[in-house]
Structure formats: C-alpha cells, structure tokens
Amino acid sequence: MPQPLIRRTSRPAAAALTAAVLAVTPLALAPAAQAATGETAATVQTEGAPVTVAPLNVLTYNVFLMSKNLYPNWGQDHRAQAIADADFFQGHDVVVLQEAFDNAASDALVARASDEYPYHTPVVGRSTSGWDATSGSYSSTTPEDGGVTLLSKWPILRKEQYVFKDACGADWWSNKGFVYAVLDVNGVRTHVVGTHLQSTDSGCSSGQPATVRAAQLTAMKTFLDGKRIPASEPVLVAGDLNVDFHGSEYPSMLADGNLAPASSRTGWTNSFDTTDNSIAAYRYPGEPNEDLDYVLYRADHARPQSYGNDVHRFHSTPWTVSSWGKSYTYNDLSDHYPVIAG
C-alpha cells in the first residue's frame, strides 16, 4: 500500500513550477462531555447577530480521493461510488467535499450523486472552465488541483474559485483555495464557501502551518468583505480547516475568519481519528487524534439562533485492495469522518 509520505493533504508554485470575528470569540465553551464511546457534546454561547434564517443542512467531508497517479491502491473508484450511495450522504441542502483530487473518481462521485444534488461547481484549481470568476494565485502549471467541490440541492446562481497564495510543504504543489457559491434557497440568497486549509506537514518549518492557515483565513475574509454581502444574507464556511477544535488555535481561527462558533459540537470526539478509523490508523499510526472539520456561519451576517456540528462516525462494509501480492482490508470510506450541520 502507499506509505504516508506527508500528512493529510496535498500550493501552487509560482507562475512556473521552478521558481475579528467582530472580535467574536466563544463566550463559554463547555468542556467536551467525553464518554468512553468517544462521543462528545460541546456547547458554545455565541454573541448577538442578525438571527433571521433557519439552519442550512450541510455535509462537509474530506473524501481522501488522492490522485491514482500517486496513490494507485486506495480504492478510489470503489470509494467514490460507495460515498455517493451512503446513507449519511443523502438529504442535505449542500455537500462540500475536500481531497476530491483524482479526476475520474471525483467526477464519478458527482455524477452518481446528481439525482440528489443536481447542481455542483467544478473542482477548485483543476482549470478555469465552468467558473464565473477565478481569483487569487491560480496557475495552470501547478501539478495538482485544490480538491474542493460543492454539490447542491438548490440552484447555484454564481460560482467562483479562489486559489491561496500562501502554502508550505506538499500543499505548495496544489491549487488549494476555496469555492464561493451563491445559492437560491427557497428565494433566500445564501452564500457558501467550501475550503481546505493548510495541512500540518513535516515539509513546513516549525509553526509555519498555523501561520499559513491564518493568512488563508484572512484572504478568505478579505474576499468576502469585498463582496459587500448584505448582513441579512447568511454566509457559511465549510470544510477541513485543519484546526483542532480541542486545541489552542481554534479561537484564532474564528477571529481570523470572522466566524461564529456553532452552538454545539456533538457526535464522535474527533473527525480525524487515528485509532478508530481504519484508513487513518494505517496511514498515521501513533499520530494524535484531531477534530478538524467544520460548518460555520460568518459572524456579522444572518445566521440561525442555534445550530450544531455533528461528527458522524461511519464505518462501511469492508473492502479490500491488493499491492505487491498482499491484501489490505478497510471498513471506512475516508481517513476523516463526515461532519453534518443543521
């Protein structure tokens, strides 16, 4: 099987390959009520903001569909089909996927889910085709795309991609950034950003990943500020933010991104679990568990009075792949668990 070369993700090289929350912070964060089963129930009080919308039902999922050119034996084609068919994948307003890197597998997943989600964006950084606008540091010569795409039950009125300038380690070689989509949700203009921030990577210098993530969140905030979106319209940010909910970087993440914390965080303790998840356990033995995936509302825009993020611990039917005459069996569809907000 492919060995874990670098942690969790794959930024653009230069033009060629050579070369605050309105000061919003959680007012009270209850310690996670952590049972032996790994379930959590964290409750957060949020500061006042326009409360005018019902919660949007959003699924965010890092699907670990790495390019088969680099990782040929991770069952990408099987997992793409199984993800689209999984019960947890059904019935949402919006789905945001990360690490949809493999072209064929990601295209197959989107196609298979098209009855449930008839509207979708292209994958960030794969090309400029299909977007209403491209901004940031997109480069057609970057080896890998950004892996983020958005699927929707509701019509997409506008779709833009933004490619981050800042990156380190393996992320430097991908067009990572964010998708910005404007949806018509029962007549309400709803803005959704899907993203995958800088991974913690041994190829980065000490402290650099957190610095890069802060710069990426600031770039996203500046982009959204420039849109002059009315405060009455909700703005959501969903994705693998690579910031541990249980860690010290979490308050800074909220402030840098102008994000309001969810009212509660429930379900499994960690969305990235190297002991409970069979793929994560194989790829990252002994590494710490982390809670990295979120659906959050912008702090100074309309948002629900109460909504939660639920880490959905899902194990699949076992599937087997072979490499160099040896078989490997897993019972998960990704090295992350999905997070559902609503």
Predicted features and spans:
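N-terminal, active-site-proximal structural segment of metallo-dependent hydrolase catalytic domains
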Residues: 2-20, 26-115, 125-134, 140-145
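Metal-dependent phosphoester-hydrolase catalytic domains
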Residues: 3, 226-236, 243-342
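Short, surface-exposed beta-strand/loop micro-motifs that present aromatic residues
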Residues: 48, 175-182, 294, 329, ...
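Extracellular/periplasmic catalytic domains that process cell-envelope and extracellular macromolecules
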Residues: 50-54, 88-90, 112-115, 140-144, ...
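Active-site beta-strand/loop signature of hydrolases that rely on acidic residues for catalysis
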Residues: 57-63, 83-107, 151, 181, ...
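Surface-exposed cleft-lining segments at the edges of enzyme active sites
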Residues: 68-70, 161-170, 197-213
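Stable alpha-helical elements in mature extracytoplasmic
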Residues: 79-83, 105-109, 147, 160, ...
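Structured beta-strand-rich core segments of catalytic domains in phosphoester-bond hydrolases
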Residues: 94, 100-198
